[in-house]
C-alpha cells in the first residue's frame, strides 16, 4: 500500500459528468474535509456557523460501495458543485486502497476547482497511469492486465 493519497481526473473531457478519483491512506479524510451533506448546509444557514461543526471523518463510518449525495465546498463553505460521491473501502477497490470517486459536472472550471481543493487538503496530483500502477503493486491486477 502506498502512503501518499493521490487525486486525478478519471474520465475524458467533453461529457456532462466528470469523475475525479482519489486513492490512498487518507482518501476518506481528504474528501470528507470538503464534502457536505444537504442537511448540514441547510442547518448551517439556520444557525450560527460556530455552533455547527463538520466532521471530516464522515466517510469513516459509512459502508463500502455506497453512494452519497452532497456538495463540495471550499474553506469558506462556499459550494463549488453538487456531486455524487462513490465510496470504495480497501481492499475492495481497484487499487486495493481506500478509493473515493467524485462525480461532478463536466465543466473544466468546476473540475479544476475541486481538484485544487483536494490538493489543498492533502492529496497530490496523480501521475499518468498511477492508479493502475497501484493496482498492480497491491496485487489487484497482474502485469498482462496492467
Predicted regions and their residues:
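A glycine-rich (often HGG/GG-containing) alpha/beta subdomain
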Residues: 1-146
